[in-house]
Amino acid sequence: MKKNEIIKIIESIFPKEYREPWDNSGLIIDLDKEDIKKIYLSVDLLYDDIKELDDVDMVITHHPLIFKGIKEIDMNASSKLIKHMIKNDIIYYSAHTSFDVQSSGFYKFYKDKLKLSNTDFAIKVNDDRGYGVVGDIKDVSLKDLGYIIKEINNAKYIQVYKNNNRNSRLMILNGSGRDFVENAIEERPDTVITSDLGYHDIQALRNAKINLIIQDHNSSESAFVNIIEDILKKHTNGIEIVKNFSSFTDNVEII
């Protein structure tokens, strides 16, 4: 299948024009190659997994490897990955905030997996787009919800902070929730599920009597891989897909 056809499929659901101005979603490494037979999917592209790229034609990640621009190509991990992809004729595409803001992404994943009702975007961009999801859940304790989140995202660890005795209204902010703590306090859900919070963020949610479940950033968005795989399988024929779920937390030891 042609690379432009694959990109067209992805952008028909997650248009890159909806990315944030600071983001680098879209085609990042474009080469003369047109035919795509094997695609590599991952949330992040890690140097530890570079050997897995040897026979792929295209890499699609959630987080863009090239984010704020490049001033030099040296011997750091990102530069080595860039050189490897160019040398091996590998097309590289990222769907980051263009993916985040659509209801068919993480919004639908968490809504379906947790059987949420009365849902809406946690942080609205407009009536049709936004970040995360708020919704109601039935008959699940806070601790059990933590186990469910750990299982559906294949997370290595989960932190659970019980700050009240309710667990009906949830606010889920996949990825970093640090910029949206004030939104959460204003919304007043029973429980917030997110990642990348600092000391004062956790303290503020405790003072607001809002339960908190923290997972690592990568795990909170691991569903990206399966969502993109499902889309590609539905709209393409004969393309081999390699899924990678490596995370920066793989080397973390819980003691």
Language-model features: locations:
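Active-site catalytic microenvironments in core metabolic enzymes, especially phosphate/sugar-handling
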Residues: M1-I255
